[in-house]
């Protein structure tokens, strides 16, 4: 597949033989982002874990200090006072059986889903719709909780989820190209700190084996893992 002229121009600014520090990489990502729109800045890590082993599954959340640059659409499965609290917290859509049926019909125009524990028996049946998209509420990520209002506030405030895939890679968003270098660096630092904190005790050898920073449709910028 041929690369675009803009991609090639961006790639020419990157020294493939160099491993950049995290701060250098985000600065370069800002420079190589698209001039036509505010590119999303992403980080990809290769971890020294075996995701096939249950005790080496790295999964968690972190609230980025400067948010993601995007206002997340959040739906909440809740009724009664919990539903009222979710609405007050700014949830985009709240409901019980009707919302569950809507999602069962294929509705997925949202970025995150939260549920009260009481409704998870019904929400759990939405696995075929929500599971492949990474949208299924989960206690481990704080999206199955009695305090749905706080969950909504956290997500709207820049909370991101990350999860190692079957190839031991982790991808996550750290902001927009319009962010300052300091904002991006602090977001990257917060995410990396949490991922490193979650290193499985059974993982041996180097934990973060490879790291790259990139923008939407942009080339990957190699990061020196020793700077992480």
UniProtKB/Swiss-Prot annotation:
Gene3D superfamilies the record matches: 3.30.190.20, 3.40.50.790
CDD domains on file: Ribosomal_L1
Protein keywords: Repressor, Ribonucleoprotein, Ribosomal protein, RNA-binding, rRNA-binding, Translation regulation, tRNA-binding
One GO BP: regulation of translation
InterPro entries xrefs: Ribosom_uL1_bac-type (IPR005878), Ribosomal_uL1 (IPR002143), Ribosomal_uL1-like (IPR023674), Ribosomal_uL1/biogenesis (IPR028364), Ribosomal_uL1_3-a/b-sand (IPR016095), Ribosomal_uL1_CS (IPR023673)
Key word Ribosomal protein present: yes
GO function term, MF aspect, one: rRNA binding
GO cellular component, one term: large ribosomal subunit
DNA repair among keywords: no
A Pfam family reported for this protein in Swiss-Prot or TrEMBL: Ribosomal_L1
NCBIfam families xref list: rplA_bact
UniProt subunit comment: Part of the 50S ribosomal subunit.
HAMAP family for the chain: Ribosomal_uL1_B
Similarity section: Belongs to the universal ribosomal protein uL1 family.
Function: Binds directly to 23S rRNA. The L1 stalk is quite mobile in the ribosome, and is involved in E site tRNA release.
Protein name per Swiss-Prot or TrEMBL: Large ribosomal subunit protein uL1
Source organism (scientific name): Clavibacter michiganensis subsp. michiganensis (strain NCPPB 382)
Gene designation per UniProt: rplA
């Amino acid at each position: 597949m041929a690369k675009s002229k803009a991609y090639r121009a961006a790639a020419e600014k990157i020294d493939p033989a160099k491993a950049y520090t995290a701060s250098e990489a985000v600065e370069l990502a800002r420079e190589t982002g698209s001039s036509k729109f505010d590119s999303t800045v992403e980080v990809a890590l290769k971890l020294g874990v075996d995701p096939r082993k249950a005790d080496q599954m790295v999964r968690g959340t972190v609230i980025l200090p400067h948010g993601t640059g995007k206002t997340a659409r959040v739906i909440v499965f809740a009724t009664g006072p919990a539903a009222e609290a979710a609405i007050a917290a700014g949830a985009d859509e709240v409901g019980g059986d009707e919302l569950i049926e809507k999602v069962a019909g294929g509705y997925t125009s949202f970025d995150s889903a939260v549920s009260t524990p009481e409704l998870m028996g019904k929400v759990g049946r939405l696995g075929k719709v929500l599971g492949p998209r990474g949208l299924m509420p989960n206690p481990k990520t704080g999206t199955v909780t009695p305090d749905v209002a706080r969950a909504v506030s956290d997500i709207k405030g820049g909370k991101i989820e990350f999860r190692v895939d079957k190839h031991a890679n982790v991808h996550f968003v750290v902001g927009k190209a319009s962010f300052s270098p300091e904002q991006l660096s602090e977001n990257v630092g917060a995410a990396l700190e949490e991922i490193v904190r979650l290193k499985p005790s059974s993982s041996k050898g180097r934990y973060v084996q490879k790291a790259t920073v990139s923008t939407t449709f942009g080339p990957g910028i190699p990061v020196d893992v020793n700077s992480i």
